[in-house]
Curated annotation (Swiss-Prot):
UniProt-recorded name of the protein: Acetyl-coenzyme A synthetase
Alphabetized UniProt keyword annotations: Acetylation, ATP-binding, Ligase, Magnesium, Metal-binding, Nucleotide-binding
GO molecular function: acetate-CoA ligase activity; AMP binding; ATP binding; metal ion binding
Segments crossing the lipid bilayer: none
Annotated source species: Rhodobacter capsulatus (strain ATCC BAA-309 / NBRC 16581 / SB1003)
Residue numbers binding ATP: G392, E393, P394, D416, T417, F418, W419, Q420, T421, D507, R522, R533
One GO BP annotation of this record: acetyl-CoA biosynthetic process from acetate
Length: 656
């Protein structure tokens, strides 16, 4: 499962750039802290837990068991706290007038809004009182289906304030997906908006909510944010104007003391088949881990402006737009738009405008902007940037090098972060000031994380440093999910059933001679060609390393002789025309980069790839098309541009 050879752009170790002598951790400190976090987790996390304010301090730290049939995860279990107090109230004495949230609207002509910690406190308290007025109590579930607007942050923190459990459904999801999630968690209330602007278009959130609620209990109430002023239908007795109510309630709402193990939120994993899988994160451990990873991974310092470009509908937005930054008293940026609207300079214009210090985005965005050319980056002053981050999928070395050269100017460490919805925060990542990097490698584990590489056939732990296999984690960390909502058996079976005694990430990895980890993609994104196992990420990296390729996605398809063949979807750089000669050149290129075994059997030119709004490529759809089995693609309304699917079907290479 993995690399048969290294792409030409993934060479050398990159030493820590100058200027990071005062980072939170240098190499020696990282090793010392990491060793303690494994050898004495109670002492290590007992100390780190004190970064939060506790109503009742904990006396117990770690109480976890990975034994199949008895899986139980508890951290700080006798402590009592409130997440909203840690994200707001405790900052009011010293930073009431500091900006907590910068809101950058979709339309660049609209002014940005700066929301201070004082204003955030008032808005969250008012929204909490609105929730109480609607009969929401501790433990009740509230579904949030909102655009990337400040009200989404207010809603999350208002739920946390009164002990309600929020479940955000990404604003690009269909009415069916929304209804499934409302029903699965038994939500009493949905918070939505009239419409959601994004890239100059509008998504009809209220209409989608109306359609979803036809399939839910008639007792579910609906709070509506009138965001754009677009005309919407109104169901009297069910729908309530949220902003109007907020003006007519008290700006003070006492926080509800919560046990550390009380659920904070449920987040449904996207793209799962069958019944949605509600990942449960609890209050104490999750918040400690989100705050600590935000501080160390990005070398966050007081006064920094932090921008994570994700949507709050994904875990990245939960941990690194809201909970991590606000627990640390940071200024966090919420961006309603997309990287290419109104043009390919939008990200960089926002960085310049708000003097962003840490910038955290997805490889798919970097590759899309690569394809537009570096001139869009060079138009803007990015001298404020200190740390660059990558999240969501393995970053191919070509994109890493471009990001480093044009965005970071060779001066910003790149933190390529491996983690998951289920992990709550970073698992394997470089730390600025501590970790020399390699383009395409997630490098070293975060504090408290014990990765192991197992043989996928025998499930035996591989002892050699240099090896390849499936990535598992051998012990718990505070940010770990606790269960699947309403289905603990499914939780145990999914994550602890296949490799007993370990948490199974579902990803393959390679560990190199320096002990660095390279994520090779989901184990179900592994192609077995003539008995050779190969991670799709490596073939994609080789293709994207070609100077005329902007993006590539690789899947397997049934092959009469090899068992599986390699099917590549390739998006070319702007201005490059597809041709048979170029197709042959790409096959030759991959043979040179990786080896003959990795040669693509079929290459389809793809002006666009099917992606979720968070930028993840939906390889499930690509596999179906490659297999010439596109009759049951399922719900594609969650894609950023569903239209690309028909184009891919029409131009498929593997016709029966």
């Amino acid at each position: 499962m993995g690399v048969q050879g290294q792409p030409s752009v993934a060479p050398a170790l990159r030493e820590v750039p100058a200027g990071f002598e005062t980072a939170h951790a240098n190499g020696a400190k990282y090793l010392e802290m990491y060793r303690e976090s494994l050898e004495n987790p109670d002492a290590f996390w007992g100390r780190e837990g004190k970064r939060l304010d506790w109503i009742t301090p904990y006396t117990k730290v770690k109480n976890t068991d990975f034994t199949f049939g008895k899986v139980s995860i508890k951290w700080f279990e006798d402590g009592v706290l409130n997440a909203s107090v840690n994200c707001i109230d405790r900052h009011l004495r010293d930073r009431a007038l500091q900006t907590a949230i910068i809101f950058e609207p979709d339309d660049p002509k609209e002014p940005a809004r700066h929301i201070t910690y004082k204003e955030l406190s008032e808005k969250v308290n008012r929204m909490a009182n609105v929730l109480l007025s609607q009969g929401i109590m501790r433990g009740d579930r509230v579904v949030i289906y909102l655009p990337m607007i400040p009200e989404a942050a207010y809603a999350m923190l208002a739920c946390a304030r009164i002990g309600a459990i929020h479940s955000i459904v990404f604003a690009g999801f269909s009415p069916d997906a929304l209804a499934n999630r409302i029903n699965d968690c038994g939500a009493k209330l949905v918070i939505t908006a009239d419409t959601a602007p994004r890239g100059g278009r509008r998504t009809p959130l209220k209409a989608n909510t109306d359609a979803a609620l036809l399939h839910c209990s008639d007792k579910v109430r609906c709070l509506v944010v009138k965001h754009t002023g677009d005309q919407i239908s109104w169901v009297h007795g069910r729908d309530v104007d949220l902003l109007y109510l907020m003006e007519h309630v008290s700006p003070e709402c006492p926080p509800r003391p919560m046990n550390a193990e009380d659920p904070l939120f449920i987040l449904y994993t996207s793209g799962s088949t069958g019944k949605p899988k509600g990942v449960v994160h609890t209050t104490g451990g999750y918040l400690v881990y989100a705050a600590m990873t935000h501080q160390y991974t990005f070398d966050y310092k007081d006064g920094d402006v932090f921008w994570c470009t994700a949507d709050v509908g994904w875990v990245t937005g939960h941990s690194y737009i809201i909970y991590g930054p606000l627990a640390n008293g940071a200024t966090t940026l919420m961006f309603e738009g997309v990287p290419t609207f109104p043009d390919a300079g939008r990200f960089w214009a926002v960085c310049e405008k708000h003097k962003v210090n840490q910038f955290y985005t997805a490889p798919t965005a970097i590759r899309a902007l690569m394809g537009q050319g570096p001139e869009w980056v060079e138009k803007y002053d990015l001298s404020s940037l200190r740390v660059l981050g990558s999240v969501g999928e393995p970053i191919n070395p070509e994109a890493w090098v471009w990001y480093d050269k044009y965005v970071g100017k060779g001066k910003c460490p790149i933190v390529d972060t491996f983690w998951q919805t289920e992990t709550g925060g970073h698992m394997i990542t470089p730390l600025p000031g501590a970790t020399p990097t390699k383009p395409g490698s997630a490098t070293n584990p975060f504090f408290g994380v014990k990765p192991v590489v197992l043989d996928p056939q025998t499930a035996v732990r591989i002892g050699e440093v240099e090896c390849e296999g499936v990535l598992c984690i051998s012990d718990s960390w505070p940010g770990q999910m606790r269960t699947v909502w309403g289905d603990h058996d499914r939780f145990q079976e999914t994550y602890f059933g296949q490799y007993r005694g370990y948490y199974f990430t579902g990803d393959g990895c390679r560990r190199d001679k320096d002990g660095y980890y390279w994520i090779t993609g989901r184990v179900d994104d592994v192609i077995n060609v003539s008995g050779h196992r190969m991670g799709t990420a490596e073939v994609e990296s080789a293709l994207v390393a070609h100077p005329q390729v902007a993006e590539a996605a690789v899947v397997g398809y049934p092959h009469d002789i090899k068992g599986q063949g390699i099917y590549a979807y390739v998006t070319l750089m702007n201005g490059i025309e597809p041709s048979e000669d170029l197709r042959k050149d790409l096959v030759k290129w991959v043979r040179t980069e990786i080896g003959p075994i990795a040669s693509p059997d079929l290459i389809q030119w793809a002006p666009g790839l099917p992606k979720t709004r968070s930028g993840k490529i939906m390889r499930r759809i690509l596999r179906k098309i490659a297999e010439n089995d596109y009759g049951a693609l399922g719900d594609i309304s969650t894609l950023a541009d569903p239209g690309v699917v028909q184009e891919l079907i029409d131009n498929r290479m593997n016709r029966a």
